[in-house]
Curated annotation (Swiss-Prot):
This is DNA primase. It holds the Pfam family Herpes_UL52. InterPro entries: HSV_PRIM. The keyword Zinc applies. One of its GO terms (molecular function) is DNA-directed RNA polymerase activity.
Length: 1083
């Protein structure tokens, strides 16, 4: 019978002395005087009849903590000896150690291979395994299988023979250092055994000992090492030792077999809650100071044998499988969603963290641990599908996320439209009073300019004079005499606390400022004044015949019989100046007629009608050809800016968004941040998918409108690339800063005004209009079917678009927040278009490309056909038509011409049809946008917010009155002592500065109190860095608050003036928990 197929026991042992020295004595045929102690062991299934007994009987019988072996051993010993003696049993002895090869690292390594056959040998083995009795070395010597044992050591012996030159010198190479290949082959074939090892040990004892000690590197482990590594409980000491060292004696760093460290194994065994009897040895963990006690304790444990031990392996394997299955489920969801979930980078990071948090938050983990806890002693553990961790996460999170991957489901499940229906008469009046007058409609012939255009300061004075004239007749003045500013913070004047420090402390503690404001109160700026004037339709019914004009708007325009609403424009002038314009009628044809297709291009456009619109590639190339024909025909465009506002009005013009009016055209400010230049054919193909996604979303959002994604127009305008050396002035930064009510936000972030058109970057990259018509001819459209072979766009980092989509009749939008939400929905709709992602996705740096910051009252957006202004006064980057012809377009030339109609690219244009507005979309609800941010905030509220108030925490410590005097007394008497002790330990020598310190309360909030420490000596020094020279002492603060673990904490922070410490910025040094000493301050 093959010895490898016999019943086998794998046994980990230790000795009181050096285990390597005693083992080498046995291997070389000598008898050691030091016995062996069994630490842990395991067996093969064919020995279950010996080691696995009726567990219920073991549990129910009463066994004293210390039992005399002579009384209880006889019957059990006879039964075990009978089972043992009926077969031969292999016993393999192990020591901690082994080889490390690639990804595989052994934890234990065999040293003896024995075969037990006689009753005497089995009796000694029984006492060692059942009661931890020392195993006599004579037993090992008598049962040692020489051949199998030295098969284990053959490689070590061969290596030692080579390294100690225990070969014929003729086998060496000429240099005497390397063994020849022939000699190595001969050595490998040569069998080695006890004789070779004995010879090596006799002649090279130090080298042999060193080699074996390197191999069995755990030979010197003490009992304390086992307790520390595998303890501290009996269950983990016995079960984790056996599983970690004998049942998984090798660590595999592969994906197929997940690598669990020892702490993880110990944690897994905590949920294996099978009842166990007290240890028969009578020892506690603290008593195990020698190997004889450790062996007796481990071998006498209930966890060593029986059903408890047998089921432990099955349980831990199933537990690992269950845990890894749940974890991999999250990874699979994330991997699959990564391909289809196209969201901005910030949102995707939030998604990754949220996905893990939804599966592994405290409640989910607690439920999972409860589900996998096993306490059944008899039945085999079955943990398959016991945990619903992944299912809950799928239901609560992933299903909601995946609804964003289908446009119809996304809008149905995430978007709630609040729509108000108007009657025909009300709708007609509402349309007239809330949209621009018909004078804005494009006219083929030049018309007379009626309006006003001047510098901001001039217009401000003009408006003030007009309001003074009309205020006696019912006009409500918009300019207060004393604009409000900051409320004085009297509590802080004598504390020396800077406003920056207070803001930093407020921000750190998530509390509002003292006055409860969200920003500075400022007077209305010129932008708000002009928007108010332009949207007003009249004044009170007083007799104003004594005035030159009937309405303030007529007085502002300087022309009678004009009615509003009217568009308000901002005009960027050279050197950072700006002007504003309110226009009732304009010569739009003089602006747009220069951007017409030439006669020969019209003939080509007629030929392009023959292209099959269903052919996506051909249609994209057709659109590219039309765009290039226009760009090459543009001539006599001024590139020099003017300081005269009325002249500059025709070079740069930006429409101001007016929340007082309704939105009839959706204007999207699109900026694609790209990795590399995009071929023009690819760009046109991507924008065709962009158009289809927008119109598909509108079809779903406006169910009572007739929307045809294959026919309805969508107008694209692309910016032109400036000269490489031109520094572009971000003219959207020139907006009137006083038009912002939340100006403190911009001041705190180092900006006076956030860029509107370029909200996040200052670079502007435009489409190249210098490509000659000879590069792409009509032959390209019919012959070139590869969009990737078209010439690349010259934009290197960013491509800017203006996309104008008419709101379908009879709908209109109202409100800044509504339009922002609408733009976010459309961005998601575009990302759900497969063609868009396939064509343009590989070129994009991120998937956030629609800027919603422009949809705020008083913000402006540059109109098509106008340029930006550089710092040198040069006009660059015109917004030129970028044609995307609908599939079912009947008249291509008419579609091209409609790009020049200003009624198609103004926010508040009057609908060109005679159908009045009937449905007003005034709010968008649901989780259509910022889903991840809302989920993060909700989870933070649930899991990270304190459950007890600061008042309650202080009352538990005897502070019943939350006034400044009581709080200061509490800090001085209770908290400062803990602070000084902490500083003495972690900042030696600095505690002297805090010995005579007192506190001064400077801010009391609902969940946060701020104190400033007053030094009684020379002053405090910086605790962050040692600064040179005599610097002003930093301010030191302590804040009292309750953390998310419901602990009352005190934080010490400093405000140092040194540059190294961020120049007076508040920095928290450390945080301590306030001990719970009730009634400390009651006296």
């Amino acid at each position: 019978m093959d010895k490898s197929s016999k019943p086998t026991i794998r046994l980990l042992f230790a000795t009181k002395g050096c285990a390597i020295s005693h083992s080498l004595l046995l291997l070389t045929g000598q008898i050691s005087t030091e016995p062996l102690y069994v630490v842990s062991y395991t067996w093969t299934p064919d020995l279950d009849d010996v080691f696995v007994k009726n567990g219920r009987e073991e549990i129910t019988q009463v066994i004293p903590t210390k039992r005399p072996r002579e009384v209880t051993e006889n019957d059990e010993e006879n039964q075990i000896m009978h089972l043992f003696c009926s077969r031969d049993v292999n016993v393999i002895f192990y020591l901690i150690g082994g080889f490390s090869t690639g990804d595989v690292r052994s934890r234990v390594w065999p040293i003896f291979f024995c075969c037990f056959k006689t009753q005497t040998d089995f009796k000694a083995l029984y006492k060692a395994l059942w009661y931890g009795a020392p195993l006599n070395p004579h037993i090992i010597s008598d049962t040692l299988c020489i051949s199998e044992t030295f098969d284990i050591h053959s490689e070590v012996i061969q290596t030692l023979m080579v390294t100690t030159h225990h070969l014929n010198r003729k086998g060496l190479s000429d240099n005497g250092l390397c063994i020849t290949e022939a000699t190595l082959c001969k050595l490998v074939k040569k069998s080695v055994g006890r004789q070779e090892l004995t010879s090596l040990y006799a002649h090279y004892e130090r080298q042999v000992l060193a080699a074996y000690r390197r191999l069995y590197w755990g030979y010197g482990c003490s009992p304390f090492w086992y307790i520390v590594r595998f303890g501290p409980s009996e269950k983990t000491l016995v079960l984790a030792t056996r599983y970690y060292l004998l049942q998984t004696d090798t660590s595999y760093n592969t994906l197929e077999t997940p690598l669990y460290d020892l702490q993880a194994i110990k944690d897994l065994f905590l949920t294996y809650q099978v009842p166990a009897l007290p240890n028969c040895s009578g020892y506690n963990i603290s008593d195990l100071l020698s190997f004889d006690k450790l062996s007796m304790f481990c071998c006498s444990s209930t966890y060593t044998r029986g059903l408890t031990a047998k089921n432990a392996l099955s349980y831990i394997l199933q537990r690992i499988h269950t845990d890894t299955t749940e974890i991999h489920a999250v990874s699979e969801y994330i991997t699959n969603d990564r391909k289809g979930l196209k969201v901005p980078d910030r949102e995707f990071v939030d998604y990754i963290y949220l996905a893990h948090f939804e599966c592994f938050n405290r409640k989910q983990i607690a439920d999972h641990l409860q589900a996998v806890t096993y306490s059944d002693f008899v039945n085999k553990p079955v943990l398959l599908k016991s945990s619903n961790l992944g299912k809950r996460a799928t239901a609560n999170f992933f299903n909601h996320v995946r609804s964003r991957l289908n446009m119809r489901d996304y809008i149905k499940k995430n978007v709630i439209c609040d729509v108000t229906e108007l009657g025909p008469e009300i709708g007609h009046k509402y349309t007239i009073t809330k949209t621009y007058t018909l004078s804005l409609t494009y006219a083929a012939k030049p018309s007379k300019f009626i309006g006003v255009c001047d510098l901001a300061t001039t217009l401000t004075r003009r408006v003030e004079n007009i309001e003074k004239q009309f205020s006696p007749y019912g006009w409500s003045s918009t300019i207060p005499s004393n604009p409000p500013g900051f409320d004085e913070l009297s509590n802080f004047e004598d504390s020396g606390v800077s406003a920056e420090a207070l803001r930093a402390a407020n921000f750190a503690n998530d509390t509002p400022n003292q006055s409860g404001r969200t920003g500075f109160d400022t007077s209305p700026g010129i932008t708000k004044l002009l928007l108010f004037f332009s949207a007003a339709t009249g004044i009170a019914t007083h007799d104003v015949s004594i005035l030159s004009y009937k309405t303030p708007l007529e007085a502002l325009i300087g022309h009678s019989e004009v009615t509003g609403p009217m568009p308000v424009y901002r005009v960027a002038l050279p050197h950072g100046a700006q002007a504003f314009a309110v226009i009732a009628n304009d010569t739009w044809s003089s602006i747009t007629n220069r951007y017409t297709l030439p006669h020969e291009a019209r003939l080509i456009a007629e030929d392009l009608k023959q292209i099959n619109p269903c052919n996506f590639v051909a249609a994209s190339l057709r659109d590219m050809q039309l765009t290039l024909l226009l760009s090459t025909s543009v001539k006599n465009v001024s590139k020099i800016s003017s300081n005269i506002p009325k002249d500059q009005l025709y070079i740069n013009r930006n429409e101001l968004f007016n929340t007082n009016l309704i939105i009839t055209n959706l204007i999207l400010d699109v900026d694609f941040h790209i990795r590399k230049p995009i071929p023009l054919g690819i760009l046109h193909a991507g924008m065709r998918a962009f158009r289809h996604g927008i119109l598909t979303a509108m079809q779903l959002l406006f169910p009572k409108a007739v929307v045809n994604p294959n026919k309805d127009p969508c107008y694209f305008y692309k910016t032109a690339c400036p000269e490489p050396t031109v520094e572009v002035l971000d003219d959207d930064n020139l907006l009137d800063i006083t038009s912002h009510s939340d100006i403190d936000f911009y001041i705190e972030n180092g900006e006076l005004y956030t860029c509107v058109e370029e909200n996040y970057t200052e670079d502007v990259w435009f489409f190249d209009t210098q490509t000659t018509s000879e590069v792409h001819t009509h032959a390209d459209v019919s012959n070139n079917e590869n969009l990737h072979e078209t010439l690349p766009c010259n934009c290197k980092e960013k491509i800017g678009f203006r996309v104008c989509v008419p709101i379908p009749n009879p709908y209109a939008l109202v409100g800044s927040s509504t339009l922002k939400g609408f733009a976010q929905i459309l961005q998601q709709a575009v990302l759900l278009e497969r063609e868009f992602v396939e064509y343009i996705g590989p070129y994009l740096r991120d998937f956030s490309f629609i800027d919603t910051g422009v949809y705020s009252h008083g913000h402006s957006l540059r109109l098509p056909f106008f340029s930006k202004v550089t710092t040198t006064g040069t006009a660059v980057g015109q917004l030129l038509p970028f044609y995307v012809v609908p599939e079912q377009c009947i008249d291509i030339l008419a579609f091209v011409t409609s790009h020049r109609n200003p009624a198609n690219f103004h926010f508040h244009s009057r609908p060109q049809s005679n159908v009045p507005v009937q449905f007003i979309l005034h709010n968008l609800g649901g989780e259509y946008a910022e889903f991840f941010e809302r989920k993060v905030a909700r989870n933070k509220q649930i899991f990270s917010s304190p459950q007890i108030s600061l008042t309650k925490a202080l009352k538990e410590r005897g502070v019943t009155c939350l006034d400044a005097f009581t709080l200061e007394a509490f800090v001085d008497s209770t908290i400062l002592e803990s602070i000084v002790e902490h500083i003495a330990v972690h900042f030696p020598g600095r505690d002297r500065e805090y010995t005579l310190t007192s506190s001064k309360c400077i801010a009391i909030k609902r969940d946060w109190v701020l104190f400033q420490l007053i030094c009684g000596t020379k002053g405090f020094t910086c605790l962050r860095y040692p600064h040179r020279g005599g610097r002003t002492a930093p301010r030191t603060f302590v804040s009292l608050r309750v953390d998310h673990h419901n602990r009352l904490c005190i934080s010490l922070a400093q405000q140092c003036f040194a540059t190294k410490c961020d120049s007076n910025r508040m920095h928290t040094i450390f945080t301590l928990e306030v001990p719970n000493y009730p009634n400390l301050t009651s006296s």
